[in-house]
Regions:
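Low-complexity, compositionally biased segments
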Residues: 10, 78, 100, 155, ...
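A structural signal for short, hydrophobic/glycine-enriched beta-strand patches
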Residues: 1-150
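A transmembrane-helix-recognition feature enriched in membrane-embedded lipid enzymes
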Residues: 146-172
Length: 194
């Protein structure tokens, strides 16, 4: 998976769509979640540098009081992203849902995933298994979050079970909602793959 993961923005290839994987903005203690902060900053960097034209914000919206896509949208607009370049996926309950829905609902088969490196590995594993072309922009991770890394260990086993044993699909699919392509010029090197 290493050839598909980019740690440096300047090395990241252009793709029309960047998919920001959701997480809570705050911990239960009320402290800002650094994973969230780094993902938002990574999305702003990719967008502002012209590496992506649209940001698909995929996250959990299970409760009226908890809405990851809308929270990300507000912060990205505050950061200067044009609201017309933001698409919301309210059914990104888990990584498998976010990746597969990007292909099957938002009609995008070649995109940049924006998340931390450890999460990139699982997201790309799912994408490649499903025949989806994706690359990942690996944003920084907080250094002292052992509980998240422990959770990731379990999530990887869950992903293997979902793909190979249960053959799970996203919880919700729905009608096709293509992300617009006509508003932006596509650079000449848009089809370069690692």
């Amino acid at each position: 998976l290493a050839p598909y993961i980019y740690d440096e923005l300047q090395d990241l290839p252009y793709r029309q769509v960047g998919v920001v994987l959701g997480t809570a903005k705050y911990y239960r203690t009320g402290v800002i979640n650094q994973y969230y902060r780094y993902r938002i900053q990574g999305a702003l960097n990719a967008y502002n540098s012209g590496k992506v034209n649209y940001l698909l914000l995929s996250g959990d919206n299970a409760l009226q009081s908890y809405n990851e896509p809308m929270t990300m949208r507000r912060d990205l607009i505050k950061g200067g992203v044009d609201p017309a370049d933001i698409v919301l996926d309210y059914a990104g309950f888990r990584t498998l849902d976010s990746i597969v829905r990007t292909r099957k609902v938002f009609d995008t088969n070649d995109f940049i995933i924006i998340t931390q490196r450890f999460h990139c590995e699982r997201a790309l594993f799912i994408a490649l298994h499903m025949g989806i072309q994706a690359q990942c922009y690996a944003v920084p991770s907080p250094k002292d979050m052992w509980s998240v890394r422990l959770r990731e260990f379990g999530a990887r086993f869950g992903a293997l079970a979902d793909l190979y044993i249960f053959k799970r699909e996203p919880r919700f699919l729905g009608p096709l909602i293509p992300i617009p392509a006509q508003q932006h010029d596509v650079p000449d090197d848009a089809q370069s793959y690692p």
